[in-house]
Amino acid sequence: MDSGMEEEGALPGTLSGCSGLHPVLPSDLDVISDTSGLGNGVLPSMSEEKVSPTRARNMKDFENQITELKKENFNLKLRIYFLEERIQQEFAGPTEHIYKTNIELKVEVESLKRELQEKDQLLVKASKAVESLAERGGSEVQRVKEDARKKVQQVEDLLTKRIHLLEEDVKAAQAELEKAFAGTETEKALRLSLESKLSAMKKMQEGDLEMTLALEEKDRLIEELKLSLKSKEALIQCLKEEKSQMASPDENVSSGELRGLSATLREEKERDAEEWQKERNHFEERIQALQEDLREKEREIATEKKNNLKSYKAIQGLTMALKSKEREVEELDSKIKEVTTDSTKGREDPLKTQIPRFQLREGSEDCEAALVEKEALLAKLHSENVTKSTENHRLLRNVKKVTQELNDLKKEKLRLEQALEEAHQEGNRGARTIHDLRNEVEKLRKEVSEREKAVEKHYKSLPGESKTKFHTQEQVVRSLTGSGSQEDLLLQKSNEKDLEAIQQNCYLMTAEELKFGSDGLITEKCSQQSPDSKLIFSKEKQQSEYEGLTGDLKAEQNIYAHLAKTQDTDSVSNLQAELKEVLALRKQLEQDVLAYRNLQKALQEQLSEIRSREEEPFSFYSDQTSYLSICLEEHNQFQLEHFSQEELKKKVSDLIQLVKDLHTDNQHLKKTIFDLSSVGFQGSDRLELTKQEELVASKEDEDTLKFEADVETPFQSDQHLEQSREIMEDYAEGGCKSGYGRHMDSNILGHDGAQTPGASEEHTLEDELLGLLATLFSKKATPLLESRPDLLKALGALLLERICLAEQGRPGDHLDSKTEKALQQVAVQLRDELGHSFPANSFSKSYNEVKSMWGNWLVKTGDEDTVELKSVSVQTMAIEDTPHGFKPQSKRDAWAEKQEEAIFSTELESEALGEMPGQQATHLSFPSAINPDAEKTGLLIQLKTPELLENLYNLPASPEVVVAQLQGQVLELQRELKEFKTRNKQLHEKLILAEAMMEGLPVPNSALVNVPAAQAVVRTAFQDNPGEQEGPETTQSAGRDKDMDSDQYTSFEIDSEICPPDDLALLPACKENLEDLLGPSSIATYLDSKSQLSVKVSVNGTDQSENINIPDDTEDLKQKIHDLQTELEGYRNIIVQLLKHSQCSEAIITVLCGTEGAQDGLNKPKGHIDEEEMTFSSLHQVRYVKHMKILRPLTPEMIDGKMLESLKQQLVDQEQELQKEQDLNLELFGEIHDLQNKFQDLSPSRYDSLVQSQARELSLQRQQIKDSHGICVIYRQHMSTMIKAFEELLQASDVDSCVAEGFREQLTQCAGLLEQLERLFLHGKSARVEPHPQNELLKGLRTVEGNLPYHHLLPESPEPSASHALSDDEMSEKSFLSRDPKPDSDTEKYPAMASHFPQDLLMEHIQEIRTLRKHLEESIKTNEKLRKQLERQGSETDQGSRNVSACGLALHSSLTSEIHFLRKQNEALSMMLEKGSKDKQKESEKLRESLARKAESLEQLQLEYTSVREENERLQRDIIEKERHNQELTEEVCSSRQELSRVQEEAKSRQQLLSQKDKLLQSLQMELKVYEKLAEEHPRLQQDGSKCPEASDNSFDLFESTQAMAPKSASETPLLSGTDVDSLSCDSTSSATSPTSMPCLVAGHHMWASKSGHHMLGLIEDYDALYKQISWGQTLLAKMDVQTQEALSPTSHKLGPKGSSSVPLSKFLSSMNTAKLVLEKASRLLKLFWRVSVPTNGQCSLHCEQIGEMKAENTKLHKKLFEQEKKLQNTAKLLQQSKHQEKVIFDQLVITHQVLRKARGNLELRPGATRPGASSPSRPGS
């Protein structure tokens, strides 16, 4: 509609208001229509150049124009209205027509003014369009000028640069030519000197020829004499002999002279030939270089020609563009002239038409005012014309300037062409100089060929000199054969000696192989630097040396044979060289023999060292166990999953058989090598040896059963429990024979006994039994218990009954007679058996100690009711309040079954415990590691759940009182804790340092000593006996403890969920207490389960987030995404901190051990691992709590109830810590006592179970790797589902795309990390990737999760022997490195080294270095340990017990002997270290060199890659710019097409409107005629009252006619279409809404207005108002009709009085007046309609003209668009060509520069080569 309005504004205006009054207009107005056609013709001429689809008017312009037009229309209507009223008031009757005509003339004047204003506006628009075109043309010209200037300047710069370069090149060429001329002169001088030398040589050759001729003559004389003397043989034999003797010395002398001369001549000829050849090569190189220079210069000239042509073409294109611009400017000038002529014509025509009119109306003053206004308007137009003409002049000046600039450009072009011609001339000069150089080179070639010919002639003259050599060669060959035979004899003797030595070595090696076969296998697979590996290495070295010697001997024999065969062909020099080789070989043989003897001595020394070392059992057992671990750990570890059950059973049986064989071999070697009597075993230990040999098979079968079960069900905790129970029952049946549960302390009674402090004589039997047990366990007499399983069963049952009775609160006097008898029998048996095995004074341990322990325990149990209550409540909450998916169903079921068993069947539980003596023994034998608090709480939970549930209701009712009491208790407990910590800190540090030094592990940090988790792990890691913590009992307890730990762990996490955020600080304390509560065998499994549970927690958290319904609000979604992002950032920070922490721990280890990169991440201190696990899991908890709070916020009731629970939990934790500190006091004294007695029990029999423990550890490792792989698979699946859910959530709601993308990237990164972890667990080796942050995250995850299966071995199987601990570490390192080499510290420091050379070499080097360093560290640590222990024993003699003082002397002597032995071992190891370190330094240097080379190649490749990538990016940018430009052009074309379609639609709609308005006007004309007739009849009615009946009859007929016409018009109105009515209503909204606003269509802007039209058109508001007026008039007329009928009726005249007739007359007159006013209003409303001609198929000439003009304008616009696109394409092509030209020119210049530099360098090198002392100058960049 906007464009429609614009077109309406452009259409001409005709008469407004007078069309209805004057049906016939004067013929003079025809001229106006013509002028209006001219006015219409102005529009396309203006818009032909300027109107474009992009240059459209704004809505504001349209609105302003509409408002102005409305105001003018309103003012005009008001003026007309008031004028008409004034005229009616002043004049009446005949003068009315004059005033009407006057008003019409004024209206015409106003319309003419408006037309003038419109034309002025059109002129202004045209002038603006011309100005914009001129400006655009000027800007384009300026831009073209600037581009041309830039191009010209660039070309000038390039040409000047090229000229300067060519001048420099010419200068350089001249300098080179001068140097070449100087070189030729020197060569000429050299040639002359050589020619003189040649002439001298020729003279010498002539003398030699004379000598040869003389010799030939002598030979002829001798032959003649021989012929003459043959006839006289008998007579003259003596003379012949003398003559022959005389002739032979002459020949010898002459032959010697000839030889000397020939040798000198030969040397001179060779020198001459070499010099000539050098000269020839030099000239050829120079010729080639000059030819290359010629070619390059020709190429440069060709490229310059091409560039000049291109620039010429570009200049031609610019000139063409300028010409086109000039044409456009000319066209604009012509159009401006046309516009001016049209404007002048437009001014003249209305003046011509108005002159006769004004002549008619000279009498009126208004006409004069109108004329004055017209004159003023003409003056304005004249001034505007003047300004237009000045603008035209300015445009012409601009055109002149453009032509001048074109001329300048042409001049510059000519100048550039001249410069190009000059450059061509210079190129021709250079070509001439090159031609001259070629001629000189050809001359030099000819001279060289002549010299070559002379030399060839000289060589041909010397063919027969080699004949004289044969005589001398024969003599030399004879002498050599003699010497060769002597050397053969010597070689045979040496070979015999070597064979004897080899046989002796073979005998020695066969003997040693039988003894140390297993050690050889270990060295081959583990790559450890042990003495056995040195032996094999020396053997291989000797064999290789002997093979080399035999090869040398064979080579010597072949040389001699070759000499014997080719006596005649070889020369003297070759024979001499061969003699030298023989002498060198002889020397080498002697050196090899000496080296062999030295090696033999070294071998013997090593054998003696090995025999002495075999007396140490620890290293031997470590070798055995490491060999077993290698046998068990195959390369394809995870192929076991694909095996069937039968194959697994076969494999297991094979492994068991192999273990049995190895065990028997080891026993045989022990019996043969070691002397058992020297070690001093007890008889019971020997029995254990034999028993353990018999029980290997049974143990291995049970282990395989457990291994198969683990493989089949890796994730089911219930089946683990059942299997562990079955295994324990099997072990109970077999008895505790394997020595896993020996050495119990008196602290066993600290939690298994139940004697009250008030007990009296009734329990003497039990007291005796307890005293016996205390002495028994303190004296380490468990072999007796091992041989008596029935005793252990009875003891276990009795102790459990005691515990149950004590827990249920029953007194001790309710014992049955059976139990008393059983106690008596056990006491008697123990006394008898202890009397045999121990002396009497060993029972002197005081009973008070035991009693005090019982008392302490009972005091503790009294205080711990609250602890039990709390633990039970925690676990019930864990059962009831677990969220969905938080814990597996199997674990919940297992826990529920445990609770039911604990509540309803305590007797069955006690029986099961009684039937498991192995587990009981393990639990009882670790007072220092298993906290009694943990077991007491576990037993109380199982046995006292009914009582505790009853006691739950006995708490005080008011929470405030409870809170106050709990806070007071907490403060008291904290004070006590501080006191205990200050007391025990020193003891802890001393104990941990001593144990770390004894076990050969790195000392943990002082910061770690204070951490309770680290203390617990260090305590569990160093115990008395290796057998105490091994075996299936420990694994079973680990399985049970794992379930218990996981349940406790989940309960703690639930508490942390329920706690308010203020109490989150309690979480680390809870974790520390929980780790202290665990047993030693379950710490590793706890760590593993903890990491797994942390993973599960996060998984389940995400599950919960998925299960929550998708929120409708996008803000909530964004908030949750933000929270999840913060969580992810927190996890990343945790991983980075863990990585830093692991690096710090590695650095601490290297500082402590004095090595750099020797130990990898596996040798971390346990405290570090525990800290990492604790921080990781606790932070998981905190994050999970946050996540849960985000997903479902807590209610206020829960927050109120949580304060009391948190205080209770704090109290429980403080009490537990206090109890733990009290227990630690007791445990420290027991541990110090055990450490002092440790070396008494060192016997090889204890380490027989190491084979089984290694196998068990390997099976556990594999199982845990499988478990972790399964967890990774589950977590990856979960991540994929989470990504899908996230995508669905994004589709369902509107989220910020940036936030969603970031979250999606993080999720995909997590999924990628999980896939890499899964591959790592499955294949053992991860593909190499470039180092970026994703790989650092993967390393962090590996260090946290992947190292768990290897770290848990040490707390599960700690040993006192340092060497064996080291071997275990090495084995774990070996297994870990074979799977994943990345966590190694060496590979972390040098990742490139690991990628550039093979892994096997690295493994060997690292293992050798580590073993050597570890041996040294071991010896140093043992020395330090023994020294500190001696000092401690000296300082603690008064405080120690009687056993310590009794065993001090024996310990001192054994320690001194061990110290001496270790010092010797240290010296030997230091020597070995020095040797190894030198070799490794050399190898590392070589490796570094190769690394440096490869790094350089990598850098080059990276640089190339960056350059290629930059080029690609640049090309992509260009493509994107071009695409964008194309899109803009297509958008412009589309917009223009849309505008065209819109214009066409508007034209159609206006045609329809016209047709409908014509019909309306016809109906209105008919109605107006009727009203005119009525108006004529009104005065007649007033004048003639007698003619009323006739008038009434006529009026009645008129009314009938109007009533008949009204429905007709009403029926014609609905002919309007819907769209047209809408458009009309839209146009007339303003007039309908406001009472003062007039219709929207402006007077003078009437659609389809024409004086010859047969229709009337107007607004629907005007029509409605007119219709109302007519209807009102009809009602008035009806009333008047009634009144007249009443007045004229005879009845009224008869009946009515005289006064009554006056009333209807007054009414009639008032109604007449109102009718008059109604008619006046109707007449005013009729003036608003105008006369139109509806466009039909035959009558739409004007509209068709307009449509044709629009089409022509559209075609012109299309053409202009096409031309502009062409211009743009041409300019783009020109720009591309210029860029390409610049590139080509720059490349050519670079090439020429390089070529000239090379030429200069070659020319400078040539004269320098002739002088021997001169050094060739090197130019930079050449």
Swiss-Prot record:
PTM annotation: Phosphorylated in vitro by CDK5.
Stretches with biased composition (Basic and acidic residues): 1372-1389
Transmembrane segments: none
Phosphoserine PTM positions: S485, S544, S1243, S1245, S1497, S1592, S1595, S1822
Subcellular location: Cytoplasm, Cytoskeleton, Microtubule organizing center, Centrosome; Golgi apparatus; Cytoplasm
Residue ranges of the region described as Required for centrosomal attachment, Golgi targeting and CALM1 interaction: 1655-1822
Entry protein name: CDK5 regulatory subunit-associated protein 2
Function: Potential regulator of CDK5 activity via its interaction with CDK5R1. Negative regulator of centriole disengagement (licensing) which maintains centriole engagement and cohesion. Involved in regulation of mitotic spindle orientation. Plays a role in the spindle checkpoint activation by acting as a transcriptional regulator of both BUBR1 and MAD2 promoter. Together with EB1/MAPRE1, may promote microtubule polymerization, bundle formation, growth and dynamics at the plus ends. Regulates centrosomal maturation by recruitment of the gamma-tubulin ring complex (gTuRC) onto centrosomes.
Region (Required for centrosomal attachment, Golgi localization and CALM1 interaction): 1790-1799
Expression (tissue specificity): Expressed in testis, thymus, heart and brain.
Stretches for region Disordered: 1022-1046, 1350-1391
Region (Interaction with PCNT and AKAP9): 1201-1822
Region (Interaction with PCNT): 1688-1822
Biological process annotations from GO: brain development; centriole replication; centrosome cycle; chromosome segregation; establishment of mitotic spindle orientation; microtubule bundle formation; microtubule organizing center organization; negative regulation of centriole replication
Tagged with keyword Cytoplasm: yes
Positions of modified residues (Phosphothreonine): T1195
Organism of provenance: Mus musculus (Mouse)
Principal location: cytoplasm
Phosphoprotein found in the keyword field: yes
